[in-house]
From Swiss-Prot:
GO terms for biological process: translation. The keyword Transcription does not apply. NCBIfam families: uS13_bact (TIGR03631). PANTHER family: 30S RIBOSOMAL PROTEIN S13/40S RIBOSOMAL PROTEIN S18 (PTHR10871), SMALL RIBOSOMAL SUBUNIT PROTEIN US13M (PTHR10871:SF1). One of its GO terms (cellular component) is small ribosomal subunit. This is Small ribosomal subunit protein uS13. Residues 94-126 are annotated as: Disordered. Belongs to the universal ribosomal protein uS13 family. The keyword RNA-binding applies. Part of the 30S ribosomal subunit. Forms a loose heterodimer with protein S19. Forms two bridges to the 50S subunit in the 70S ribosome. GO terms for molecular function: rRNA binding; structural constituent of ribosome; tRNA binding. Located at the top of the head of the 30S subunit, it contacts several helices of the 16S rRNA. In the 70S ribosome it contacts the 23S rRNA (bridge B1a) and protein L5 of the 50S subunit (bridge B1b), connecting the 2 subunits; these bridges are implicated in subunit movement. Contacts the tRNAs in the A and P-sites. Keywords: Ribonucleoprotein, Ribosomal protein, RNA-binding, rRNA-binding, tRNA-binding.
Length: 126
């Protein structure tokens, strides 16, 4: 089993697909990486040579921020926006959608479950 950037790649999948298991690498970055290193995208992970795995590892480490480094950078960016008080930071702080989505009826994932609000009490019969 090949291990790149702290992620075990699935042995039975094509390399092009297996690379997408690494956080920060999608299909297009996977294709770019394989083209730059000269590895055939149709090769199965189990058939990769140690030399090819080493080439992939070096290319990814040199050119992309992935996994823990990328997660840390994203969290720092969000924290910075919250500290400077920009609109996106305020939305993050209030746990509301950040990218302009409506909140009147939707946004349940971000806002969480509905909170019950006490309704009007019915007037009793006299």
């Amino acid at each position: 089993m090949a291990r790149l950037s702290g992620v075990d790649l699935p042995r039975e999948k094509r390399v092009e697909i297996a690379l997408t298991y690494i956080f920060g690498i999608g299909r297009s970055r996977s294709r770019d990486t394989l083209a730059a290193t000269g590895v055939n995208p149709d090769t199965r992970v189990r058939d990769l040579t140690d030399d090819e795995v080493q080439k992939l590892r070096e290319w990814i480490d040199a050119n992309y921020r992935v996994e823990g480094d990328l997660n840390r950078e994203i969290k720092q960016d969000i924290r910075r926006k919250m500290e400077i008080g920009c609109y996106q930071g305020l939305r993050h702080r209030r746990n509301l959608p950040v990218h302009g989505q409506r909140t009147h009826t939707n946004a349940r994932t971000r806002k969480g479950p509905r909170r019950a609000i006490a309704g009007k009490k019915k007037a009793g019969k006299k």
